[in-house]
Amino acid sequence: MYYEEINVGDSFPTLQKDEITRVQLVKYAGASGDFNPLHTVEEVGEQAGTGIIAHGMLIMGMAAQGVTTWIPRKNVKKFQVRFKKMTKPGESIEITGKVLEKKENNIIVGEVLAMNSEGEVKLAGIFEGVLPSKND
Amino acid sequence: MSNVNDLVGLEFEPYCFEIEKGKIREFVQAIGDDNPIYFDMEAAKKEGFQGIPIPLTFLQVIDLWGGYSFQEKMEKLKLNPVKILHGEQHFEYLEDIYAGDVLTVSSKVINVDIKKGSSGGMDLITTENQYKNQHGDLVAISRNVTVHRH
């Protein structure tokens, strides 16, 4: 993928993720080391008034998978998100993205969104990548 | 706590973490990311890496397995764990980071904002982490905004 082939407004292919399960939250807790009990322990979810919710960073991980599906991991230089809504087990997340801006030095800036099947946005992010040029 | 602004400048003990291939694989499996560069050396080399790279959000693993636990961090910040949410997360990648690298992380609170809304106030606490590899190179910077609801 070359810098010249990317245009502002281009959309990337949607990444559809499998439905989030409680087992996945347990796996993510162990893999990431985020043992906040709000993600795995029913009683704590009730105490917080939210019920069990998915790790925000799991959803960011899915968004990162989207970004590195669209442009190679090697080329990604910045990635930031704002968490908008909580995600519960049973929800299915899809990741969409588009090109917002092309800057000097072969930099592209893109938007990435994670939303559930009803279109509720869970996180909104921005990524920056440096792509090779055909002129290099 | 008396004044949440007092948190600005608070430094955490530096921590160290050796990145293992198996941990990277466990992490991408939990996310369901099947990109072969994270477990197949040939695929990683084909993309221009010299080893198995870390996924974009793997820096969190380094923080939580190498540094403070969630509970310890809440105690250090004097925050009620059931009142907090993750507001924002920023990552900047300066150099490639590979399985086998040993990263040392320095971490401190760089900003506190207090917001008042109709449904009550909240504190926004920004922590910045700097990641150096075993050669002393700064390889990544992250910033985390924690929301503490009053």
Feature names for model-found ranges:
Chain A
Residues 47, 52, 81, 110, ...:
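Hydrophobic alpha-helical context, especially transmembrane and signal-peptide helices
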Residues 1-13, 86-136:
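HotDog/MaoC-like acyl-thioester-processing domains
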